[in-house]
Design a protein with these regions (language model features):
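Transmembrane alpha-helices
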Residues: 1-31
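Alpha-helical transmembrane segments of integral membrane proteins
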Residues: 13-14, 18-21, 37-280
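Short pre-catalytic strand/loop immediately N-terminal to key active-site residues, enriched for Gly-Thr
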Residues: 34
Length: 280
């Protein structure tokens, strides 16, 4: 019925299957090394589980940085138009024109030089690694807001022509009240969907950056560092492949779960999706 047609049924079934598989893995790990051990004898499943924390931290903190920028600039650009719209469009067009990996890599390499020159500011290697992780989140945040900003601008351009917005302006309602009470609630479904999709993209971005050597500190457990270490182990005879497989499986599962959640959010909050389900 409506739950099946909206995709919520499939999301629930897939979520139950994923939870069942991971619960079985965690229970079995009490007795066996499910994914084997690393070259120094560490349990690969434990490394993979701890890497989830790094992925969630990067996704969450990066979203905290990028979301306010995207929302404020996006709805202001679409609502006010003219000069403000031109300036904001110029900013996000310029940022989008620069290849993302090159921009982030250059910023992270500059950060590494800065951390090396001020190593005495940190009392331990853990503090330096945490600062590097935080700054990577900051860099990803200030460079990753453009796509959401563009979508919010387009949606705001349509909403500002609605009758209730025109009536609010006629009654003398301030622009700030219109933005906060009328426009922002009507674009939140886009914000939620894109935020969840971008979360999975950030997990993949961390893996790519760590693989090429400009990601989190090598001492920090992450899927990117696991894949980078497994690359050398794959050249052995016999090849040690299970560390690579574990990182890939967990990364794939997290990205899949995020996309399934995004579909559920879209089905729940997108007015067009609701109308399609009701008419069918």
């Amino acid at each position: 019925t409506a739950l099946k047609e909206s995709g919520g049924f499939h999301s629930i079934i897939t979520t139950i299957i994923l939870f069942t598989i991971f619960a079985a893995l965690i229970y079995t790990s009490n007795y066996y090394h499910v994914f084997g051990t690393s070259k120094i004898g560490e349990d690969v499943l434990y490394q993979t589980m701890k890497s989830i924390r790094t992925g969630i931290i990067i996704g969450t903190i990066t979203t905290i940085f990028s979301l306010p920028i995207a929302i404020i600039l996006g709805i202001c650009s679409g609502y006010f138009g003219r000069t403000i719209d031109d300036i904001i469009q110029y900013i996000y067009t310029t940022i989008s024109a620069i290849p993302g990996i090159l921009l982030i890599s250059a910023a992270v390499l500059s950060l590494q030089v800065w951390l090396g020159r001020h190593a005495n500011w940190f009392s331990s290697m853990e503090e330096s690694a945490d600062m590097r992780l935080f700054m990577i989140c900051f860099i990803l945040g200030i460079t990753g807001w453009t796509s959401l900003c563009r979508l919010l601008r387009g949606e705001t351009l349509k909403i500002r022509e609605m009758d209730y917005i025109t009536a609010a302006k006629t009654l003398g309602v301030s622009n700030s009240s219109i933005l906060y009470k009328h426009i922002l609630p009507n674009v939140m479904h886009i914000v939620l969907i894109i935020t969840v999709i971008d979360f999975s993209s950030l997990v993949l971005a961390e893996a790519v950056l760590s693989y090429i050597g400009v990601g989190v500190d090598p001492s920090t457990m992450s899927w990117g560092n696991m894949i980078n270490s497994a690359r050398l182990e794959m050249a052995r005879e016999p090849a040690i492949w299970w560390s690579l497989a574990a990182a890939f499986i967990f990364m794939f599962s997290l990205v899949l779960a995020a996309n399934i959640f995004a579909d559920g959010v879209r089905a729940a909050f997108d007015p067009r999706e609701k109308s399609n389900v009701e008419t069918s």
